[in-house]
């Protein structure tokens, strides 16, 4: 039986690398995969999933208006799909998460979703909220804070490198805008108004 998987983490935990490896594993066995990524995130070029270690794959784009079940069913009828993989799945809508569950339940195709659990305010993304609620399997991909603890929070930095937790939920950026930290240092960095000061303090403790 196919299942719906949600692989979640903070930033820079290797989600895209894990997705590309999973897709490769299917293809190596002669199976066909379809990869989706969010249209909104074009840091590495539109229409592909890229990892920080240099791997990449062509990808279909989804936005808030995409009818994922209809798209996948139509393509599956043309040529059998053995696995659907979705990067940046935090940007899915509630309806799209439901449609992906229908891909699993009605078409018997496994769906592997990779994304962030929470935003820079510590709030769940809509897509992540419903994947946490409806997935068959939840898998945490771990990354670490500068202190060595598990990083479960994401700090957003302004142009001067100062952390803040107000404003639009979605601002596309890489390492220069977002930093993964543990909960303790997330709170301390916001209180002090400086991630650098917290890192320096930790080094001298």
UniProtKB/Swiss-Prot annotation:
Catalytic activity annotation: thymidine + ATP = dTMP + ADP + H(+)
GO biological process, one term: thymidine metabolic process
Binding annotation for Zn(2+): 145, 147, 182, 185
Keyword Lyase assigned: no
Compartments, record wording: Cytoplasm
Coiled-coil features, chain-numbered ranges: none
Keywords, alphabetical: ATP-binding, Cytoplasm, DNA synthesis, Kinase, Metal-binding, Nucleotide-binding, Transferase, Zinc
Enzyme category, top tier: transferase
Catalytic machinery residues: 88 (proton acceptor)
One Gene Ontology cellular component: cytosol
MF (Gene Ontology): ATP binding; thymidine kinase activity; zinc ion binding
PANTHER family named in the record: THYMIDINE KINASE, THYMIDINE KINASE, CYTOSOLIC
Assembly and binders: Homotetramer.
Annotated protein name in UniProt: Thymidine kinase
Species the sequence originates in: Shigella dysenteriae serotype 1 (strain Sd197)
Gene: tdk
């Amino acid at each position: 039986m196919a299942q719906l998987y949600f692989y979640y983490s903070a930033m820079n935990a290797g989600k895209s690398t894990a997705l590309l490896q999973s897709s490769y594993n299917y293809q190596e066995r002669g199976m066909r995969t379809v990869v989706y990524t969010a249209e909104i995130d074009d840091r590495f070029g539109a229409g592909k999933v890229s990892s920080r270690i240099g791997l990449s794959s062509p990808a279909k784009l989804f936005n808030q208006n995409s009818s994922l079940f209809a798209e996948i069913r139509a393509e599956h009828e043309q040529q059998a799909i053995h696995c659907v993989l979705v990067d940046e799945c935090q940007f899915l809508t509630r309806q799209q998460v439901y449609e992906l569950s229908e891909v699993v339940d009605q078409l018997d195709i496994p769906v592997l979703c990779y994304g962030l659990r929470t935003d820079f305010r510590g709030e769940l993304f809509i897509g992540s909220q419903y994947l946490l609620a409806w997935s068959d399997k939840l898998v945490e991909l771990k990354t670490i804070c500068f202190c060595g603890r598990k990083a479960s929070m994401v700090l957003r930095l302004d142009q001067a490198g100062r952390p803040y937790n107000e404003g639009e939920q979605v601002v596309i950026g890489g390492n220069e805008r977002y930093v993964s930290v543990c909960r303790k240092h997330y709170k301390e960095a916001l209180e002090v108004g400086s991630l650098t000061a917290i890192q320096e303090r930790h080094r001298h403790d």
